[in-house]
Structure formats: C-alpha cells, structure tokens
Amino acid sequence: VVRTRLQARYFDTADQRLAADGMVLRLRKEGRRWVQTVKATGDNALHRLEHNVDLGATGGASPAIDPQRHQGTPVGDRLAKALAASGDAPLVERQSTDIVRLTRDVRVTGAGGAVVEMALDVGKVVAHAGTPDECESPVCELELELKRGDVQGLVSLAHRWSQQHGLWFSTVSKAERGVRLLAKLEVVPAVKAQTPRFP
C-alpha cells in the first residue's frame, strides 16, 4: 500500500464558466511534486477527458496556474474555447482539497486477468477558504481504475466490494463537491438517467 498526501487547488472564472462547461482545472501537490490537470466530461458518466502536466518540485511554493500548458491536446483545446467564450476572464481559486490517498493494485482472477488500482481517499473539500463563508465537506471514497485487462474484471471487483462493504457507485468528483459547496447545495436536482455505454 502506498500512502500519498494530495493537496489540490481548483480554478475557474468568477462566473464558473469551466464548471458550467463540465471542466475542471487544478493544481495538485502530490507528495513533493506539483501536477497541473485539466479534465472534462466525455461521452458518458464513466468517460472523462484528461491531460496532466508534471511541474516537478518547486521548493514548496505553489506554481501559477497556466492554461497554456494544455495547448494542443483535445481537452486543452476545449479549455481554450471555454476561456475564450468567457472573454478570457481571469482564473481564480474556487475551492481546495486536502486528501490522504492509499493506493494498491489488485489482480482480478478470471477471464481477462484485469489489474485494478484501488485508491482510498480520505480528507476534505473546502470552499470559500479564509472567508466568513468558509465551509467544508468530508471525503471518504474508493476509486477503482482499470490499469490493464478486461473491463469486466473492474466491474466484477466493484460489484463484489459494494456487496461486501456497503459501498455505492457515484460519479460525483471532488471538484463537483466543491461546486456544490460554493452554491450551498447538499444535492443537485435529479436528472433522468440514460442507459450507460461502455467502451
């Protein structure tokens, strides 16, 4: 089991243009290294576009956010369009997270011989930091990611763990939790579900 402290800062325009477009732009300290990431919704709830830029160790100081680091990638182009549509409004820190992550690779027996990374995240999401409106929400989630093999191995492992440990499936990201905190929403309005499409 590998233990890592993850401290992330999430950026958006003041009117939350990126969130409205299903995008997240963050700087995250992973141990001693900084990584800038942009994510966007994909074709379905299980598919996300993502691009990471390793910024290395910066002597403890947080580097400045720079959307240009993602230029020339599909999600970077989408980010550039969203920012241009906002009139190139400045990016501001909207929320942050402080998480301890425990990771382990699990080999799933059976057809396909899948290897799944299990990541247990425990910590908090904070919105309005340093203001009278500061609020936080606890995080305790288990993320499963297929590293190689058949997706059925991942589904089988998720089903087994949900049955044995009372877990439930959620597509709500830490960034979305922060957006809900900013809006003072416990839950979002219900939407009609669509049949999932698996790759």
Question: Across the structure, where does each feature detected by a protein language model lie?
Answer:
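Phosphate-end processing signature that detects enzymes handling 5′-triphosphorylated RNA
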Residues: 1-199
